[in-house]
Amino acid sequence: MKRREFFKSAVVSLAAVSYPSWKGYADDNTIPIEIPAVTGSRQPIAIERIAVEEFRKSLNGRLLLPEDDDYQVARLVRNRSIDKRPALIAQCRNSEDVQACVNFAHHYQLLTAVKCGAHSVSGKGTCDGGLLIDLSPLQGVSVNPTKRRIFVTGGSLLGRLDEATLPLGLGTTAGTVSHTGVGGLTLGGGFGRLGRRFGLTLDNLKSVEIVTADGQLRYADAEENSELFWGVRGGGGNFGVVTMFEFQLHPMNPKVVGGRITYSFSQVKDLLRFYGEHSVKAPVELYYDPVIFAPPMGFDKMVYFDVCYSGPLDQAEKVLKPLYSAGKVLKDNLETIDYMTLQKSGDDDDPRGASQYLKGGFITDVTSGLIDTLVDNLEAHPTRGSMAFFQQSGGAINEVPADTTAFPHRYANSNLITGSFWPYGVDTAPHIEWSRRYWRKVDKFTKGFYTVDEFSESQQQVNKNFLGNYDRLVKIKNQYDPTNLFRLNANIKPTITAG
């Protein structure tokens, strides 16, 4: 069977997945005659009730309005400091639902957001007064172990991918937190514990099905709609809503050595210096993230390495020995573990269920100036946890030329992230201000940023961040989204006036 035919059969089989039934609106008089909303340019409009009802009837999934019982839960994202209220939430069950949403949004020029795993720290997976296209019901996977391919629907979480492939002795790069949405991670880049072996998640993308701004469902790969396929690999959600991903899989032992090594904080600068020197020459099977953390409630500051070694197990001791020699070990919980278990190990610790603020940038060298800035300015606080950590890059990620995909940052050896989190419901302003001050001191050591972590960058910064790929991305935007319907992202603004 040809790959394209298998892709189509996978779409059919995944579309047949059943979902829980839902109760429609109890009574017509619970819906206002007109629904207040906003356009992409933030202009207020009113949508006729009859149009909303027709839209609702066209969907296989649910359409939620603010008065509906499930609306308050459906509007939430993982960063609890984001408190937005869409005018409509469409919970899509298939590609046809997504097409209906895009056509409806295009007709009314609605502000449009797309949500998968709700991990967008900047809140771009939701909106105030617009249409939220919620892909969370659109979950399913189909594996072709012979061809080493997996087909993943647009609302799926990374854990579904790992669960389907690892028992078959196959794997691919899929982040570090299992409840991350596959869409946002893939379209922006896709770092992960296997990235140094297999490349970014987007480097393993072989094809997509995508609903573009004209409501058309298009197939794109290296041969068909090849420019669109190039653009979605790093251009984020600028060109449409991906409803199906096809990924390359690789042979992989589902057993790895992973966990955490915690060191004495008195050696934190030496440990970061070690990381800067050792990580760039470490085997590609070794991935480790150094974390410096100032916990809330007066607990001592911490420094630790989160580790994953996915190479031959009989070589693990030799490969990991330098990490044990890097500093005074206070706690060691490295063990031979199922990779799937390791992928889920940080789910409960992930701060994205609290209020938070993150900033990030790419690093080529871990200099003494950077180390001093990170450590000396990390501030303890009674209610705020603050941290800085490195996502290790290099290896297969950096072997790809900068213009092979739209993701240009192949020079980076690490993605540095700083951030803070605090309890939901407390005043966010002082915590955000501290986070911004901390980042301003760190930013001068970075070069470019990961668009998945983009928070408040200016349009000029976003444009510049695509480096030599920007002009090509603008041409693709002009072709597939000339009205900038998909603007809640690291936005590539079209340069033509749509007819």
Task: Locate the predicted segments by residue.
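Soluble FAD-dependent oxygen oxidases
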Residues: K2-G499
